[in-house]
């Protein structure tokens, strides 16, 4: 009969369970790491003045697509940090030094193009098919098309001669689009006239993909326009237009340059599409608020109203974009409801 040493058996069982628990913990950690990696965002940029970057002797930002991963978050001394993995290096980076830019369907920002007859007459797009190819090749998610406007010197109403070509391209590709009207009203009577023109235009151009808010385009011509001295009153004048459109169930968006928006239009109960050009031949990887040199960056009231940002008037040499045309970023969370 075999004698069993109960003491040794107990020790063996305890050791076995300790090893088992350790293996379970290790497998859990590995699983968590794998899961973290799978969920990591490759569209990450880290400022080059962080300790993590300096430790790797980097002189530039880590660019999108360089296999940068956010593993998890850590709070240290009441400050939030991201645990970042870059190749074989892992380090902590302050939350405010990490920026996300994802070009996937879950992107924080989406590309938008705006066009007019000038884009046809200048030879940028000679056919509808050429414009369709541009939209597809560059992953343009939204489009604004000029419906017409009022002349900035004589004040005559005009319509865009080529809007149908751009409209039909968006309809064919099922890309949500909207129209814009260049406002130059100098009084309430002209504002009412413009509102009536817009309503009639929309009545005659009801299409399935015309889903975006109608844009009132406030251009600044620097001393050349009949409205240049009226900027302190322009908000009041265009309110006559937007109120009439709203009463007809038309949602509106205001386009203006960032400085004029902040100086003269900030108190309007409106969302804004602002023009502020970066001067860089690339698609921005940060939102407008990160550009500290522009006037509205630190104005929380202004920034809370901006949902679209025209960052270039000459195109951006990225993503095969070689056309010299207006390009904008929009906040996806604000625009995806129009799909």
Region annotations inferred by a language model:
Residues 202-232:
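Active-site groove signature of glycoside hydrolases
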Residues 33-81, 85:
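Beta-loop motif signature
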Residues 2-20:
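N-terminal Sec-pathway targeting helices
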Residues 35-39, 85-105:
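Boundary regions of SH3-family modules and the immediately adjacent low-complexity/disordered segments
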Residues 100-150:
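Boundary/entry segment of secreted carbohydrate-active catalytic domains
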Residues 105-123, 273-339:
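Functionally critical loop-and-helix segments that line ligand-binding/catalytic clefts
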Residues 129-139, 160-175, 198-209, 296-303:
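Acidic (Asp/Glu)-rich catalytic clusters
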Residues 110-114, 141-146, 176-181, 210-218, ...:
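Structural recognition of the beta-strand scaffold that forms the well-ordered cores
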């Amino acid at each position: 009969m075999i004698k069993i040493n109960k003491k040794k058996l107990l020790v063996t069982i305890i050791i076995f369970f300790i090893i088992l628990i350790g293996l379970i913990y290790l497998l859990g950690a590995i699983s968590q790491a794998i899961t973290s990696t799978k969920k990591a965002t490759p569209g990450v940029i880290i400022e080059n003045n962080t300790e993590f970057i300096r430790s790797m002797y980097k002189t530039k930002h880590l660019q999108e697509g360089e296999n940068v991963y956010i593993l998890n978050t850590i709070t240290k001394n009441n400050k939030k940090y991201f645990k970042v993995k870059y190749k074989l290096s892992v380090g902590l980076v302050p939350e405010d030094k990490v920026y996300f830019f994802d070009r996937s369907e879950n992107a924080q920002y989406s590309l938008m193009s705006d066009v007019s007859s000038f884009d046809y007459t200048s030879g940028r797009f000679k056919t509808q098919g050429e414009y369709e190819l541009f939209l597809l090749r560059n992953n343009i998610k939204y489009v604004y098309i000029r419906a017409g406007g009022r002349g900035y010197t004589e004040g005559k109403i005009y319509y865009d001669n080529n809007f149908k070509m751009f409209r039909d391209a968006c309809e064919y590709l099922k890309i949500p689009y909207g129209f814009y009207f260049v406002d130059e009203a100098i009084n309430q009577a002209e504002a009412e006239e413009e509102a009536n023109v817009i309503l009639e235009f929309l009545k005659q151009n009801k299409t399935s993909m015309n889903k975006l808010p109608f844009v009132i385009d406030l251009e600044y011509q620097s001393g050349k326009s009949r409205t240049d001295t009226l900027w302190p009153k322009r908000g009041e004048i265009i309110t006559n237009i937007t109120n009439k459109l709203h009463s007809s169930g038309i949602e509106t968006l205001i386009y203006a340059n960032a400085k004029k928006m902040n100086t003269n239009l900030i108190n309007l109960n409106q969302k804004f599409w602002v023009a502020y050009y970066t001067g860089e031949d690339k698609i921005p990887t940060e939102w407008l608020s990160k550009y500290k040199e522009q006037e509205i960056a630190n104005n929380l009231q202004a920034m809370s109203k901006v949902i679209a940002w025209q960052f270039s008037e000459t195109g951006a040499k990225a993503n095969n974009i070689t056309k010299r045309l207006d390009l904008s970023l929009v906040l996806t969370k604000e625009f995806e409801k129009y799909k």
